[in-house]
């Protein structure tokens, strides 16, 4: 969602798309994550704070696992309908970071069954909302330096 730390995959790729930079992906892009829209995550936290039991743990997740290559291709597809690119932006596979986790996934059944919380925003909706937010708030990403957004790339 909006204002995620700029070095993370989605804001980094959006920044690069807007600036016609190549899209660097670690390894073969197979590292997968469970994606959840920020508003859904905040609503889950509120549910835990107001309805959860003290001392209990509640994993917050969407059950939507996608790898980095799938997420990047999704952003490229969205960009084709939203902005005019100055040149063809390419996906560029770079050396993976040492110790880079291959998969993050949660079992969020407990929060769903005990607190009746479910994400409202599917991945496709959330990624479009995020792209649109960055497109409408260009001053935000322009205030970030390129160094802040791509500082870890290539430092395997």
Name each model feature, range by range.
Residues 1-8, 31-32:
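Flexible, glycine-rich beta-alpha linker
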Residues 11-156:
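C-terminal substrate-binding subdomain of Rossmann-fold SDR/epimerase-dehydratase oxidoreductases
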């Amino acid at each position: 969602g909006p204002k995620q730390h700029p070095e993370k995959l989605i804001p980094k790729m959006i920044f690069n798309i807007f600036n016609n930079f190549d899209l660097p992906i670690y390894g073969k892009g197979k590292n997968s994550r469970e994606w959840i829209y920020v508003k859904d995550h905040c609503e889950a936290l509120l549910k835990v704070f107001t309805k959860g039991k003290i001392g209990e743990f509640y994993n917050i997740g969407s059950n939507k696992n996608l790898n980095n290559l799938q997420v990047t291709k999704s952003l490229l597809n969205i960009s084709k309908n939203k902005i005019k690119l100055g040149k063809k932006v390419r996906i560029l596979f770079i050396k993976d970071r040492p110790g880079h986790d291959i998969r993050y996934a949660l079992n969020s059944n407990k929060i769903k069954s005990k607190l009746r919380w479910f994400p409202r925003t599917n991945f496709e909706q959330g990624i479009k909302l995020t792209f649109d937010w960055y497109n409408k708030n260009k001053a935000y990403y322009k205030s970030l330096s390129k160094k802040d957004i791509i500082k870890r790339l290539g430092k395997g």
